[in-house]
């Protein structure tokens, strides 16, 4: 129990410390999105960002202990359904230490998009994640177009507009 309570604090401290130490290396809008290859959470196989080149991709980092993730995951389901045929995809990257925690969360908040798992934390390190949830909207050329930190219901309309604009390019 204590371990579960301390884990988010330790992760957040580490992320903030690494951010402080590497401000010059921060991933910014306009940068090429860092590549990743991660195991799928619910099925066999891997998810690689390069497989989605040519699509607009929303890479969303989440965890079962993240309150705003309870709002964002269902909204992302809706956005994916709305824009998928136009070339939009969502990739969710779970950062829970225990797979069961993520699976229990997805039973309560099911998603219809690919979900990967990164227990080692190498991908959030590459993206210099500062908090949860954080997402990166990536254009068809693989460049970061938007960094979306946190989530509230009122974000869904502006996010939808941003996705629609990118899909037209």
Features from the language model and the residues they span:
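Thiol-based oxidoreductase modules, predominantly thioredoxin-like and allied folds used
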Residues: 87-99, 111-120
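Short pre-active-site segment immediately N-terminal to redox-active cysteine/selenocysteine motifs
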Residues: 55-57, 61-65, 131
């Amino acid at each position: 129990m204590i371990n579960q309570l301390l884990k988010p604090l330790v992760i957040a401290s580490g992320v903030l410390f690494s951010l402080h130490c590497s401000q010059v290396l921060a991933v910014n809008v306009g940068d090429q999105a860092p590549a990743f290859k991660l195991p799928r959470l619910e099925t066999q196989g891997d998810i690689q960002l390069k497989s989605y080149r040519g699509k607009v991709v929303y890479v969303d980092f989440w965890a079962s202990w993240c309150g705003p993730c309870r709002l964002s995951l269902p909204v992302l389901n809706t956005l994916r359904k709305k824009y998928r045929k136009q070339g939009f995809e969502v990739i969710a990257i779970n950062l829970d230490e225990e797979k069961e925690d993520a699976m229990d969360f997805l039973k309560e908040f099911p998603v219809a998009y690919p979900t990967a798992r990164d227990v080692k934390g190498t991908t959030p390190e590459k993206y210099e994640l500062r908090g949860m949830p954080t997402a990166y909207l990536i254009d068809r050329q693989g460049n970061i177009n938007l960094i979306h930190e946190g989530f509230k219901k009122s974000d869904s309309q502006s996010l939808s507009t941003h996705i629609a604009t990118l899909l037209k390019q």
